[in-house]
């Protein structure tokens, strides 16, 4: 029972995640005022809980994260990197603020973020899908398709499958059709792609 635990825990269920349209790590960071996400680029994001930092590049021994990210019970946090996750078909997200090293190890100095996926259910057939589409003026189209299916295989077994396809459209124009380098006189012609 969450009320019997002597630590700061926040649990956000599937209905609330769907209502807030949480699809990635940036959405998870917005679930709690104690969380900060430093999005350093693809595959190079870092969570901080309560402002506790790893020291970044000023740490000569390597920047081990102070906030651990778990998918179910599997740790995903590595030195200096957190993989980009597409969050779909999730049961809940648990945010454990404060030191968790005794239970979860050294990457939990400031806390843990646990993403718990939905488990197969032997009692019902369940399926669903979500489609998103968008466009940017003078850019290409964004689209995503997400689907899940739960199917009982007998009295004691079931299978649950989740999948997604995502395409982020670009909006940066290559306005420089060609460039001539001064020293060599070499010209790069990008006019077909500009």
Task: Give, region by region, the residue ranges found by the protein language model.
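Extracytoplasmic beta-strand/coil segments of soluble accessory domains associated
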Residues: 9, 26-74
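Outer-membrane beta-barrel translocator/receptor signature
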Residues: 65-66, 88-94, 100-183, 187-194
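Short acidic/polar hinge/loop motifs at secondary-structure boundaries
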Residues: 58-60, 66-99
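Short beta-strands and strand-coil junctions in structured, solvent-facing domains, enriched
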Residues: 1, 18-19, 35-37, 55-57, ...
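N-terminal periplasmic "start-of-domain" segments of outer-membrane beta-barrel proteins
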Residues: 1-20, 45-48, 67
């Amino acid at each position: 029972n969450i009320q019997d635990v002597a630590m700061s825990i926040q649990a956000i269920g599937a209905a609330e995640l769907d209502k807030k349209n949480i699809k990635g790590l940036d959405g998870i960071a917005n679930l709690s005022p104690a969380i900060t996400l430093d999005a350093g680029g693809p595959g190079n994001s870092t969570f901080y809980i309560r402002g506790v930092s790893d020291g970044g590049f000023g740490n000569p021994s390597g920047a081990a994260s102070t906030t651990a990210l778990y998918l179910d019970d599997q740790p995903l946090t590595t030195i200096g990197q957190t993989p980009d996750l597409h969050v779909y078909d999730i049961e809940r997200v648990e945010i454990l603020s404060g030191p968790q090293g005794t239970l979860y190890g050294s990457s939990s100095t400031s806390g843990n973020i646990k993403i718990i996926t939905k488990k197969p259910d032997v009692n019902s057939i369940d399926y669903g899908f979500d489609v998103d589409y968008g466009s940017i003026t003078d850019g290409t189209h964004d689209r995503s398709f997400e689907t899940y299916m739960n199917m009982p295989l007998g009295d004691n077994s079931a299978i649950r499958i989740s999948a997604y396809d995502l395409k982020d459209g670009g909006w940066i124009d290559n306005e420089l059709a060609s460039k001539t380098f001064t020293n060599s006189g070499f010209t790069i012609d990008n006019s077909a792609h500009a």
